[in-house]
Amino acid sequence: MLFSPTIYTSLPSSLFLTFLTKPPLKHTHTYAHILYKTMSPFKIFFFTALILAAFSASDADFNTDVNVAWGNGRGKILNNGQLLTLSLDKSSGSGFQSKTEYLFGKIDMQIKLVPGNSAGTVTTFYLKSEGSTWDEIDFEFLGNMTGDPYTLHLMFTLKEKVTKSNNSISGSTQQQISTLTQSSGTLKESCKLKISRFLPDTLTVDDTPIREFKNSESIGVLFPKNKPMRMYTSLWNADDWATRGGLVKTDWSKAPFMASYRNIKIDSKPNSNWYTQQMDSTSQARLRWVQKNYMIYNYCTDRKRFPQAPKECATS
């Protein structure tokens, strides 16, 4: 699989600031690792999040493992628990959440995005811990006009209490990577995303690494490894910012919009040592190739926003 050098206008930085908070007595970092442009709104996307549930490996059942959390009937579990659908109309969107929290292990799930004109809509899959100092990892698929690519907006939010100062610190870090296609140049049928949260935090698309976020706690960089997270998905309207910075609004004549989730698989492990695979030299070379040829924006080189590069940039 190759990244297509598709040119597009990047979304404004202010989009990421909506995810930042400045609560008192908190130390906050937000990592918006990837804006990744997918090729087609009709395709199915495969997610692998390396996390841990309180149960063992299994082909999970939506009836058993999740609750439809909101939407007043717009979220439905079908096919004996094997399919979950979310819908969005002008009144409301919908979403579900897992019954169990996760820390170490793996979740696989297939997601089919809103087809056709999905402008203004956001389809999500994310992990979030409880409490006022939560960690969060977000996949947000930002809809677009018919035939135009989706944009994958990936956020990391990490928080901890500040013990020696009443000041709070906020940060937003971003990268943008252009479109993925088949080696023949045709549109991809699907992409498989993987997150390893524990050794380096490695993001891959179809086994091609596109981001490595190493555990750099030794130099004062927060890393998400201590707080169990609950799994969430949602479909909602964000036409004030989601498509071309809010210039393209949701076409409600196309409602209801529908996204679907299936083939959820959950694996659990007793501790963080179960996943020990490091990037080999080939993977590291592929990562550098992607960054060189298809990275549109890299927060590590944005001196206007970060006169001094964030600490993790030295090791990523």
Regions from the PLM with identified roles:
Residues 40-316:
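GH16 jelly-roll
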